[in-house]
């Protein structure tokens, strides 16, 4: 009798855009199911996630929506999370890509996320493109990316 080692189950691969990331980081409405969905998953994104998250945290702090302590805590989390995510660099190849949604015309930074997710998906299937932005969800769907069933 031979015993074959069981193949380890494949980790879910989730592409997280900035809207979903900030929702979790700032504990906005709907953050709990998003956070639960990311548990144990391989988290993918663009390096733009870090830039956009930090910029939004500065904006919120300047508007008084975050205390200095909250700002510092959030910035520290972004720095730690940068080491948890697999991040796609913004390269000339990504900029030259012809990948565009069929109908939707996304903003430039949204397009960076879409092209990055598409690149990851081409390398190895992603299980879900996670976003809080309805237009971004629709654009991802147009590109054939698996999307959340509904914006959470």
Task: Locate each region found by the language model.
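Short, well-structured N-terminal submotif of metal-dependent ribonuclease cores
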Residues: 1-50, 60-72
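Acidic, PIN/NYN-like endoribonuclease modules and their adjacent C-terminal/linker elements
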Residues: 1-13, 46, 119-152
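Residues that scaffold the ATP/ADP-binding catalytic core of kinase and kinase-like folds
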Residues: 23-25, 56, 139-140
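Short alpha-helical
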Residues: 29, 51-52, 135-138
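Active-site-proximal, substrate-binding regions of enzyme catalytic domains
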Residues: 48-102, 120
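Active-site neighborhoods of divalent-metal-dependent phosphate/nucleic-acid chemistry enzymes
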Residues: 84-135, 145
């Amino acid at each position: 009798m031979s015993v074959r080692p069981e193949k380890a189950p494949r980790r879910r691969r989730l592409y997280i855009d900035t809207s979903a990331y900030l929702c979790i980081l700032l504990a906005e409405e709907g953050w709990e199911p998003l956070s639960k969905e990311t548990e144990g998953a391989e988290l993918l994104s663009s390096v733009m996630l870090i830039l956009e998250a930090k910029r939004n945290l500065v904006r919120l702090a300047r508007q008084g929506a975050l205390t200095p302590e909250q700002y510092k805590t959030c910035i520290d989390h972004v720095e730690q999370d940068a080491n948890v995510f697999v991040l796609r660099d913004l390269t000339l190849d990504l900029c030259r890509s012809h990948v565009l949604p069929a109908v939707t015309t996304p903003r430039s930074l949204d397009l960076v996320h879409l092209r990055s997710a598409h690149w990851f998906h081409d390398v190895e299937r992603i299980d879900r493109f996670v976003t809080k932005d309805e237009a971004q969800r629709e654009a991802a769907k147009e590109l054939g990316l698996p999307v959340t069933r509904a914006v959470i």
